[in-house]
UniProtKB/Swiss-Prot annotation:
Gene this chain is encoded by: hscA
Species of origin: Tolumonas auensis (strain DSM 9187 / NBRC 110442 / TA 4)
Coiled-coil segments on the chain, per record: none
Lineage, broadest ranks: Bacteria, Pseudomonadati, Pseudomonadota, Gammaproteobacteria, Aeromonadales
MF terms in GO: ATP binding; ATP hydrolysis activity; ATP-dependent protein folding chaperone; unfolded protein binding
General function of this protein: Chaperone involved in the maturation of iron-sulfur cluster-containing proteins. Has a low intrinsic ATPase activity which is markedly stimulated by HscB.
The protein's name: Chaperone protein HscA homolog
Alphabetical UniProt keywords: ATP-binding, Chaperone, Nucleotide-binding
Any Pfam family hit: HSP70
Length: 616
């Protein structure tokens, strides 16, 4: 059966009409824009011949400066010059933990961070939009045409709020977002690893502000994401801060510093760091102090941070179920991978020389451009297979009638994704897998595709069993869903055609409704999640009371807990999410002493009949 023809709204039906779509690497420190011309992906330069646009925006009383011009003015005007804004995307004021930033932060009504400037308060979405506008202008001037769409890359560890903030920034800049693409995936595309030797590939991405590690398996031209890890607040900026602190210590400067001095220190540290990638020793001068630092001293400063990235690599490899020596290729991404120590330790960890032939600053933008060119429809008919995408998200039902999306809409096929789930009740030996299609948050608003049951789950405590559910869509659009209990290997599977019976008008209606009811759906999901959590707490507590309540509680204590239980049961019937959450907290507080006594009792029983030396 032929795949349902899917086209993005507004795209021309003409099969060979050239359309311009660009890939944008919206980075913490630097940003780039790239395009595919005549089949070759290239980054676009500004009038001065520079590929890289520093991700810096300076607010002036009568205008803006963006990029290198703004970066150069940062030391003189740190309060109005916003750098590394990507770190603040989707964050609340309470999430900002760095104390050495020169900005004046405030919290908005909804808790989102704002920054005070001479033009008033601005938020990270607005700042990012200015960077995107500059890249869009560069692209339209270089191409002599308007853009039909963009693919913007984000760290794999970005959460929903951070991803939505990125989309909001693009829309504020007047862009049509074809897709957000994980940076490691873009790098793999840039290196053409999809047509290389089958096996395991690691993508090590250390940028200015984020670190991501992705373990991929290539099989028959399909990348399966086996595991991901990383740190959304670790990158080359942290190298700069450590080096800046070292310089300040050598110069006998006492913190806290003025914003201007802080910016001067960071600029100097960044310059010294870059020089140490190619030199053994660099002369350093600041204030009244002059001295030098060698590469070994710098490496001593940053070794703990680099080793921290390797801990993430180790966890990702373990999660993927492979060994480091099984990795065929290691792709290095991000400007911070130019640091010799990073390349050395990563190479030692994986036991092979990392791939560095493509400029690590450009590789993500290049991969995004290749993906954008595919999505906008510029490939010849012989390659149209690459254009087939999943029209609506695929997922499964979780407790409370919620939908957990496994493969998002617009994912290019073939594709594979896996996610772990667990049991809800003690002794649960079977699990119903309900496969769904759609963009809404509730099962009742999505399209049911199939159901099957996984039996033979070991009767363990709630949450102890681990079931891996894998979704795979082949080149013909056939979806296979399998579920496997990890400890026993017992599994079940089903195949279904997601596009069967789906008319284009149905798909468009479902997409429109997902936008129209987005806010309502999120509120409904939050309510259901709290009700499910209440059920979980009540189920667990009732079992504990049945087993140990009479022995460990006085009648008065039991009465207090029963009142708290009844309060939660009553409030759970309503529609006030915050009230349910508060009732759960109140019940937790009412049972805290009971929980402590149960723990003490369990420890005494475990130690009963044992000697002290046996315990040691």
């Amino acid at each position: 059966m032929a795949l349902l023809h899917i086209a993005e709204p507004g795209l021309s039906a003409a099969p060979h009409q050239q359309k311009w779509a660009v890939g944008i690497d919206l980075g913490t420190t630097n940003s780039l824009v790239a395009v595919v011309r005549s089949g070759v992906a290239e980054t676009l330069k500004d009038e001065q011949g520079r590929d890289i646009l520093p991700s810096v925006v300076r607010y002036l009383p009568d205008g803006l400066q963006i990029g290198a011009e703004a970066k150069h003015a940062a030391a003189e005007d740190p309060l109005n010059t916003i750098q590394s804004v990507k770190r603040f995307m989707g964050k609340a004021l309470s999430d900002i933990t760095q104390t050495n930033l020169p900005y004046q932060f405030t919290g908005a009504d909804k808790g989102l961070v704002h920054i005070n400037t001479c033009q008033g308060e601005v938020n990270p979405v607005q700042v990012s939009a200015e960077i995107l506008k500059a890249l869009q202008l560069r692209a339209t001037e270089a191409l002599g045409a308007e853009l039909d769409g963009v693919v913007i890359t984000v760290p794999a560890y970005f959460n929903d709020a951070q991803r939505q903030a990125t989309k909001d920034a693009a829309r504020l800049a007047g862009m049509h977002v074809l897709r957000l693409l994980n940076e490691p995936t873009a790098a793999a595309v840039a290196y053409g690893l999809d047509s290389g030797q089958e096996g395991v590939i690691a993508v090590y991405d250390l940028g200015g502000g984020t670190f991501d590690i992705s373990i991929l398996r290539l099989h028959q031209g399909v990348f399966e994401v086996m595991a991901t890890g990383g740190d959304s607040a670790l990158g080359g900026d942290d190298f700069d801060h450590l080096l800046a602190d070292w310089i300040a210590e050598q110069a006998d400067l006492i913190a806290p510093f003025t914003p201007r001095v802080q910016r001067q220190l960071l600029d100097l540290a960044c310059d010294v760091k870059q020089q140490l990638s190619s030199q053994d020793t660099v002369a350093v001068s600041f204030a009244q102090w002059s001295g030098s630092i060698d590469r070994t001293q710098f490496e001593d400063l940053i070794t703990p941070l680099v080793k921290k990235t390797l801990m993430s690599c180790r966890r990702a490899i373990k999660d993927a179920g492979v060994e480091a020596d099984e990795v065929l290729e290691v792709v290095m991404v991000g400007g911070s991978t130019r640091v010799p120590l990073v390349r050395q330790l990563v190479g030692d960890f994986f036991g092979r020389t990392p791939l560095t032939s493509i400029d690590p600053d450009k590789v993500v933008a290049v991969g995004a451009a290749i993906q954008a060119d595919i999505l906008v429809g510029n490939k010849p008919e012989s390659e149209m297979l690459l254009l087939d995408v999943i029209p609506l998200s695929l997922g499964l039902e979780t407790m409370g009638g919620l939908v957990e999306k496994i493969i998002p809409r617009n994912t290019t096929i073939p594709a594979a994704r896996a996610q772990d789930f667990t049991t809800f009740k003690d002794g649960q030996t079977a699990m119903m897998i309900h496969v769904l299609q759609g963009e809404r948050e509730l099962v009742s608003d999505c399209r049911s595709l199939a159901r099957f049951v996984l039996k033979g789950i070991p009767p363990l405590a709630a949450g102890a069993a681990h079931i891996r559910v894998t979704f795979q869509v082949d080149a013909d659009g056939l979806l296979s869903v399998s579920a496997m209990e990890k400890s026993t290997g017992v599994q079940a599977a089903i195949e279904v055609k997601p596009s069967y019976g789906l008319q284009e008008e149905d798909m468009l209606r479902m997409l429109r409704e997902s936008v129209e009811f987005a806010e309502k759906d999120i509120k409904a999901r939050m309510l259901v999640e709290q009700k499910v959590e209440a059920d979980r707490v009540l189920e667990s507590l009732r079992q504990a009371l049945s087993k140990d309540g009479d022995a460990l509680l006085s009648p008065e204590e039991r009465s207090v807990i029963n009142d708290a239980i009844q309060n939660l049961v009553n409030i759970q019937q309503g529609d006030d999410t915050d009230a349910i959450k508060a009732a759960i907290t109140a019940l937790d507080e009412a049972t805290s002493e009971f929980a402590a006594r149960r723990m003490d009792s369990s420890i005494r029983q475990a130690l009963q009949g044992h000697k002290i030396d046996e315990v040691n």
